[in-house]
């Protein structure tokens, strides 16, 4: 299993219940494949430019461990789900040392 992060930009028009239902749908894919996850709600933020004619969006960060082949299915579901404006998934390093972080900064 590997560690991943997916940042989601959701429509500001989604109700809190609709947001939770959407996240439950995504998290169930991870859980079904024996992955572990955390969900961080960053909340409503102003956007630097309009996205689908909206100047605000709701950000959610999913941090999880799963098998790499599950990412394809997760991203497929994200692409066809209404209410998700944008997303980005990245693979995290297994062990990041402080020295490596200093080199990046």
Curated annotation (Swiss-Prot):
Disulfide pairings: none
Q: What's any one GO cellular component for it?
A: ribonucleoprotein complex
SUPFAM superfamilies the UniProt entry points to = Ribosomal protein S6 (SSF54995)
Keywords assigned: Ribonucleoprotein, Ribosomal protein, RNA-binding, rRNA-binding
Query: Transmembrane ranges?
Result: none
Biological process terms in GO annotation: translation
Q: Which GO terms describe its molecular function?
A: small ribosomal subunit rRNA binding; structural constituent of ribosome
Q: Which InterPro entries match?
A: Ribosomal_bS6, Ribosomal_bS6_sf, Ribosomal_S6_plastid/chlpt, Transl_elong_EF1B/ribsomal_bS6
The function of this protein is: Binds together with bS18 to 16S ribosomal RNA.
* Family statement drawn from the similarity comment of this UniProt entry: Belongs to the bacterial ribosomal protein bS6 family.
Quote the protein name from its UniProt record. Small ribosomal subunit protein bS6
Q: Provide the species name.
A: Lawsonia intracellularis (strain PHE/MN1-00)
């Amino acid at each position: 299993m590997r560690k991943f992060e997916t940042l989601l930009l959701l429509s500001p028009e989604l109700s809190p219940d609709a947001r939770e239902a959407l996240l439950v749908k995504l998290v169930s894919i991870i859980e079904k494949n024996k992955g572990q996850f955390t969900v961080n709600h960053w909340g409503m933020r102003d956007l630097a430019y309009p996205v689908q004619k909206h100047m605000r969006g709701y950000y959610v960060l999913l941090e999880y461990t799963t098998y790499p082949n599950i990412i394809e299915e997760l991203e497929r579901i994200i692409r066809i789900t209404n209410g998700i404006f944008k997303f980005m998934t990245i693979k995290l390093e297994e062990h990041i040392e402080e020295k490596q972080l200093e080199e990046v900064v």
